[in-house]
């Protein structure tokens, strides 16, 4: 699977369902973000980037490439 680009709509497993949003930032080095008061970390590299995603409801998440798939 190739890397995603900014603006790509993606989804991921979340609880018993899925989350969905649009990629707004891409990281190829380890990253730490404070999201809703929590420090979220992801290891990242050129082969396994991390993605900062804005969900459809405006919430933001940080996900690794391996956690994502293209949304329809």
Name each model-derived stretch.
Residues 33-41:
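Short, surface-exposed loop/helix-turn segments at secondary-structure junctions
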Residues 26-32:
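Short, conserved beta-turn/loop elements at beta-strand boundaries and strand-helix junctions
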Residues 19-26:
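Short beta-strand-centered aromatic/proline hotspots
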Residues 41-72:
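Intrinsically disordered, low-complexity, charged/polar segments
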